[in-house]
């Protein structure tokens, strides 16, 4: 079993839900990411999603776009993100790390380092899962096999508009968990309709037999608690970015820890 599968199995045995915070790698300071990841774990995170900065992030709302632009300006690319994961792994060998991003940086990395280099290097760095927003499941079988060969799960997004056929395609190649995008549109947008999420999850579970995480639009502990009643995991990203984007270096980790502790407490209530 993968580290992600182990984590979900352990949580399910205790009747708990996974807390999955997201942050753009290298934001808001290029050297802060490993410390921020350790803070997230201390606050109760079960899995960490690290955003790989990209210049044209079509699924990201303005908050995460801006974070990505800042990280890119600081010189953060895929190679630097893998180095951050390596650094995190020096002190943590148990918390799963998922890279979330777009096809272009992966393809550029492979052009530079050779075919299969991404899966190899991500596995060596200690990455557990990869979510590539613009890789369709029907074209991913080889990529999924490459990742599996290095112990890495391939994670997919599902949306309110996803058809049964799409869910079946995802179910064939996905592992670890699937990420249900609870709003139409981009990350961090609009208010979350928890009743609509609750209605959708049984449809997803008809086809997908791995855990389902829900994200996009979860901004506070109360919403996380409501989603945690029906989903296997709660993903929070834009809100964390907003909380830390204008903070001085010495406050970033503490602010994140305080916020996530409140969410963890609500999820466990």
UniProtKB/Swiss-Prot annotation:
Catalytic site positions: 49, 60
Gene Ontology terms for molecular function: tryptophan synthase activity
Pathway assigned in UniProt: Amino-acid biosynthesis; L-tryptophan biosynthesis; L-tryptophan from chorismate: step 5/5
Keywords assigned: Amino-acid biosynthesis, Aromatic amino acid biosynthesis, Lyase, Tryptophan biosynthesis
GO cellular component terms, semicolon-separated: cytosol
Enzyme Commission no: 4.2.1.20
Pfam families found in the cross-reference section: Trp_syntA
Catalytic activity: (1S,2R)-1-C-(indol-3-yl)glycerol 3-phosphate + L-serine = D-glyceraldehyde 3-phosphate + L-tryptophan + H2O
Annotated TM spans: none
Recorded superkingdom: Bacteria
Protein's job: The alpha subunit is responsible for the aldol cleavage of indoleglycerol phosphate to indole and glyceraldehyde 3-phosphate.
UniProt cross-references to HAMAP family, sorted A to Z: Trp_synth_alpha (MF_00131)
Matches recorded under NCBIfam families: trpA
Subunit-level organization: Tetramer of two alpha and two beta chains.
Similarity section: Belongs to the TrpA family.
PANTHER family: TRYPTOPHAN SYNTHASE ALPHA CHAIN, CHLOROPLASTIC, TRYPTOPHAN SYNTHASE, ALPHA CHAIN
Protein name, UniProt field: Tryptophan synthase alpha chain
């Amino acid at each position: 079993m993968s580290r992600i599968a182990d984590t979900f199995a352990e949580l399910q045995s205790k009747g708990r839900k996974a807390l999955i915070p997201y942050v753009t790698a290298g934001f808001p300071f290029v050297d802060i990411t490993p410390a921020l990841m350790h803070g997230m774990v201390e606050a109760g995170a079960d899995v960490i999603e690290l955003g790989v900065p990209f210049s044209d992030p079509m699924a990201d709302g303005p908050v995460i776009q801006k974070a990505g632009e800042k990280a890119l300006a600081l010189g953060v690319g895929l190679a630097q993100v893998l180095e951050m994961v390596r650094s995190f792994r020096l002190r943590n060998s148990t918390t799963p790390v998922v890279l979330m991003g777009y096809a272009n940086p992966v393809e550029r990395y492979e052009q530079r380092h050779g075919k299969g280099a991404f899966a190899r290097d991500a596995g060596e760095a200690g990455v557990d899962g990869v979510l590539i927003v613009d890789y369709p499941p029907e074209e991913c079988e080889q990529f999924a096999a490459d990742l599996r060969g290095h112990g890495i799960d391939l994670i997919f997004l599902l949306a309110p508009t996803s058809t049964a056929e799409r869910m079946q395609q995802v179910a064939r190649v996905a592992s670890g968990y699937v990420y249900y995008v609870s709003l139409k549109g981009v990350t961090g947008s609009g208010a979350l309709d928890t009743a609509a999420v609750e209605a959708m999850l049984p449809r997803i579970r008809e086809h997908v037999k791995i855990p389902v995480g829900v994200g996009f639009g979860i901004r506070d502990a109360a919403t996380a608690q409501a989603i945690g009643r029906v989903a296997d995991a709660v993903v929070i990203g834009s809100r964390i970015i907003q909380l830390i984007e204008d903070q001085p270096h010495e406050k970033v980790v503490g602010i994140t820890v305080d916020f996530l502790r409140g969410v963890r407490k609500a999820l466990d209530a």
